[in-house]
Amino acid sequence: LKREGIIAFFSKQRTILVLYVLLATALSLSNFNKGQTKVFSGDTKYTFYNNYVIFKHSFFHLQQGKDLYVLFPETHWDLYKYSPSFSVAMAVFAYLPDWLGLLLWNLVNVLILFYGVRYFIKGPPHTIFMLWFIFNELFTSVLNSQSNPMIAGMLVAAFTFFEKDKVHWAALLIVSTFYIKVFGILAALLFLFYPNKWRFILWSAIWTVAIGLLPLMFTSTDGLIFQYQNWLRLLSEDHSGSIGYSFMGVLQTWFGLQSGKDVLVIVGLIITMLPFVFVHKFKDLQYRINWFASLLIWLVIFNHKAESPTFIIAFTGIALWLFTTSINKTVLVLAVLAFVFTSLAPTDLFPASIRHSFFEPYAIKAVPCILIWLYLNFQLIKSGLNKSHKIFGIEK
């Protein structure tokens, strides 16, 4: 009876919600209390919530007409890389004391992810397992005050809105992710699965313009054009930077491949688009879920700037697939690999010597995600070929 009671307690969505909130609260206060003691380079010390400081100050820089996309070493380390519109959203937090603003920022991220998964089209008990499965990965992202949980939650919610034929809300969420991190716009490909395609395109255009012009509340037209020009410049320059925990990172560190990043991304896009050939599968919910899960993984492993906190997006995709699909030996092995080497590898469960000498330089965190992405797309294409002799709805 006690065992059943414990299982029932931890199977309640309210229990998980409380734990998510406690996670955000504890990590926020812990990082705040560490003060300015973190050194990224040189002798200057910054906070342990540097990302939040970057986001917060972007609003003040927008107001002051400063170039958002240059370094401000007097307040924070690294560059601001999101859109001018995102800096407007940070107005909600900008005037709050850091301890409160940081707490609310992390709570917003955690709650958007929680409710995005909570209201996923499949519902309980699938969502209960999903929320537990991603908990540790969420820890890593919140620890870094990142926006990735928000992006994951918004994209999952967009999928659910598509399923419920609420394309205006799906469009809003997808366009919003674009103004946070550009790659989120690829989720717009979901519209190919559903009717009312022109309605989605129209709403996407409306939201793109509306959100894109938000900074005009705090800057002039010329000032906004200036910021967007600088943002585009940063994105173009940023593309030639590091390879991160990405597919390219694995190919480079494992096999010595030093070039071909653009080719790899194009090949990845082609593979991602192939399942749309099988129009007859569009009515299959699991087919749509699997493709969406594959996309969430793609957004990370083909992102040359992918860092450990980014993987909450890919891991959410893995959770959506794992707890809605039929379990076989291959699926089980892939799930264990993902949980151990993607989610647990950066933690203290593994000695620091192994993490720094093996896991990090060889981008081990990305490997299970790459394997699952390949497996998912193989299954999608195999399913499309085996179940029908039609391609693009036409008999072969």
Per-region residue spans from a language model:
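Aromatic-enriched
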Residues: N31, G35, L322-K396
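Alpha-helical membrane-embedding segments
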Residues: E163, L186, L190, I211-L216, ...
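Transmembrane helices and adjacent periplasmic/lumenal helix-loop junctions
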Residues: I174-F191, N303-I313
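Hydrophobic/aromatic-rich transmembrane helices and adjacent perimembrane loops
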Residues: E307-L322, A366-V367
